[in-house]
Regions:
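Residue-level signal for well-ordered alpha-helical scaffold segments within enzymatic catalytic domains
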Residues: 44-48, 99, 122
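Internal catalytic-core helix/loop-beta-alpha segment
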Residues: 67-118
């Protein structure tokens, strides 16, 4: 079934990095915000790498992201998808990242998982390179489907985000 991305990107003029997922899950679409599935470890990973308490409400999560200069969005603005599985995504239409790049000083884009990185490489590479001078960096997915990675291992792999935020 064809789905259109229901959320706006989260960023402000101070955003230094952008984290792109692939496309919102069924649970996220139902609850109206990024990474709303409690099994997804995105928010726990960010809290872990930044040594902060876990944000609970949507407002707290937005404030957390902006306070830490993190922009979030997804690489696809629409796609055909059954359920939440990235493996079942087809007919991908890439997101337009220009509003983020023109409204913030993003120095690095991070792709949350293989599908997000694949979309970045296939459709968004030039836009990302032109804006940041670097290709999107692939991070292991925080999705519960990525059972090969424990929370501790994800935090370790995602420390590059905290390092990028600290530098400069």
């Amino acid at each position: 079934m064809s789905q259109t991305h229901p959320f706006k990107p989260i960023f402000d003029k101070n955003s230094k990095i952008s984290i792109l997922g692939s496309f919102p899950s069924v649970v996220s679409r139902k609850f109206g915000f990024y990474y709303a599935n409690p099994q997804n470890r995105f928010w726990r990973v960010l809290a872990g790498i930044l040594n902060t308490p876990l944000s609970e409400s949507i407002d707290e999560k937005i404030k957390f992201l902006l306070a830490h200069r993190i922009a979030i969005y997804d690489a696809a603005i629409s796609c055909e998808i059954k359920g939440s599985s990235d493996a079942k995504m087809t007919a991908v239409e890439p997101a337009n990242l220009e509003p983020i790049f023109s409204g913030a000083r993003v120095v690095q884009v991070f792709a949350n998982g293989g599908k997000a990185h694949e979309i970045c490489e296939k459709y968004l590479k030039n836009q990302i390179l032109n804006a940041t001078g670097k290709e999107a960096a692939k991070l292991p997915s925080t999705s519960p489907a990525n059972a090969n990675f424990s929370l501790e291992r994800l935090v370790q792999e995602w420390m590059v985000v905290a390092d990028t935020l600290r530098d400069g």
